Amino acid sequence: MTATAKSQGPLFTKRALFTLIWPLLLEQTLSVTMGMADTLMVAGVGEAAVSSVSLVDSLNILIIQILSALATGGAVIASQYLGRRDEENASRSAAQLYSVLGISTVAVGVVCLLLSRLILRMVFGSIDEDVMRFAQQYFLISAVSYPFIGLYNGGAALFRAQGNSRISMLASLVMNVINIAGNALLIYGFGMGVIGAALATLIGRVFAAVFILWQNQDLHNPLRVQHFADLRPRRRPIMQILSIGIPSGLENGMFQIGKLCVSSLTSTLGTSAIAANAVANSVSTLANIPGNTMSLATIPVIGQCLGAGEKKQAQRYSVMLLGIAITGLAVTNAALFFLMPEVVTWFNLSAEASAMCTHVVHWFNLFSIFFWATSFTLPNALRAGGDAKFTMSVSIVSMWLFRVILSYIFVLQFHLGLTGVWFGMFIDWICRSLCFLVRFARGKWMEHKVI
């Protein structure tokens, strides 16, 4: 799905947008529902297991999000080249993305394997010994999977960049089905607990990476690696990728580090609060499915528009995708608000943890409708235009000034408990939304030279 021949006409028809969006919606739904099933299966092992997986996953997300920023950079560059109809440079940039991801993910995985216990102690401090034991087991196996999830994310981003979101959907389906089947076999069949959950995740990621790399080499794929020599690192395409990837990586990294600081604060509230927070995070992702879907769709659409020099269309499609995201979020959050008392019973939580979980999710539903899309979908339009430094600056300042600092104030000074942690996040969203809306309206985000 690339620009049409007449640049003055719409670059994306309604049919083309639908073809891009529906597999992304299904992919996000699969990812979230399978993730919830994963949490439910681990919950059968006990609250210590849920807590350990939640803590390690917050660290895993930090690492994966930093590395995924490179995939975002590669997708922006590739989509702009495709919008300019320069498939040769688009293909070369794709090859360079795979090289950068392969090298960086292996390096990070090795460091985490060698220093696993030290890293966990530094990040989470003193936690229950059972939680630490489970956490180290889960973290070690997670580290082995980093190269595979990195390559999968890179390949998925490149397929989306060309409008072929069906392949990334199928890869996600493969990964999640294997993960759930593996959980059923290893956790319940062989009684392997947290180790079984980690192994199932690893196997799923291996298959997803192999599948998407195999699909990448299809002769009809404009972003396939045409020559093995194209994988040799080259300065110019790598610098183009890093011009988006480094600011996005710093943004993602500082964002996740901030979340880890908040997780450390949450861990002081007790095992029930940790478990309630873990389930609330898992369940709230259900309501975010429309927003995440539009966030993924924004980069290829806006990237191709700007690569073709169509700034007005970039603005128009940005507003359209943002409107779809807000409408979808209103529907899913309203539904979850009323269903939450029933949903929380699925997770084998104590009465105290269930009450805390339901309370914070209800507040989440209200704020998400009005502020989530402008906080996380809209900035992807800015990134697609090469405005990654601005989104980085806003996200880092807002994250630390509001989410982190206010969370500590709300918990330690006002004794608001888990609710205080979540209200720090809501105020962060409001700040981001205001900054990104003003930046978008002024149009400076479209003035960057990316390729």
Residue ranges and their predicted role:
Residues 1-24, 78-145, 189-246, 302-368, ...:
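Short alpha-helical transmembrane segments in multi-pass integral membrane proteins
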Residues 8-40, 44-45, 61-73, 77, ...:
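N-terminal transmembrane alpha-helices
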Residues 19-38, 141, 175, 204-208, ...:
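Transmembrane helical elements of multi-pass membrane transporters/channels
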Residues 29, 33-51, 120-129, 185-192, ...:
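Helix-terminus/linker motif at the lipid-water interface of multi-pass membrane proteins
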Residues 47-58, 135, 139, 198, ...:
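Small-residue hotspots at the loop-to-helix junctions and early N-terminal turns
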Residues 50-110, 149-168, 274-340, 371-395:
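Small-residue-rich hydrophobic transmembrane alpha-helices
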Residues 62-65, 179-183, 209-213, 286-289, ...:
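Hydrophobic transmembrane alpha-helices of multi-pass small-molecule transporters
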Residues 71, 141-160, 168-176, 197-212, ...:
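Short runs within selected transmembrane alpha-helices of multi-pass transporters and secretion channels
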